Amino acid sequence: MAALTEMVDYTVEDGVAVLTLNNPPVNALSHGVRLGLLKGVEKAQEDESASAIVIYCEGSTFIAGADITEFASGPQDPQLDEVLLALENSSKPTVAAIH
């Protein structure tokens, strides 16, 4: 397992890149989560051992929304649209494992 950021880990299991998000209590889309997702998608694109990507969240919530604790500090790159564009442009099928 490789930590992409404090909140996102990268592993490959049975040929699938697994991006595991862990940002308690609700896996909000903080700067660290957005950055980790972007790094994870980029890493999976380059990883010949991965043929697909799964995004999974620890805990009981799958990405509850923006991290309101960051509102006062202003926008930080990467913005959500950059992360979504990387997911959209990925040549590998991507699945969100929502539980």
Show where each model-derived region lies.
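Glycine- (often His-adjacent) and acidic-residue-rich active-site loop
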Residues: 42, 49, 56-89
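Conserved CoA-thioester-binding segment of acyl-CoA-metabolizing enzymes
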Residues: 1-58
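Hydrophobic alpha-helix-in-membranes signature
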Residues: 24, 90-92
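A short, small-residue-rich loop immediately preceding and capping a beta-strand
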Residues: 92-99
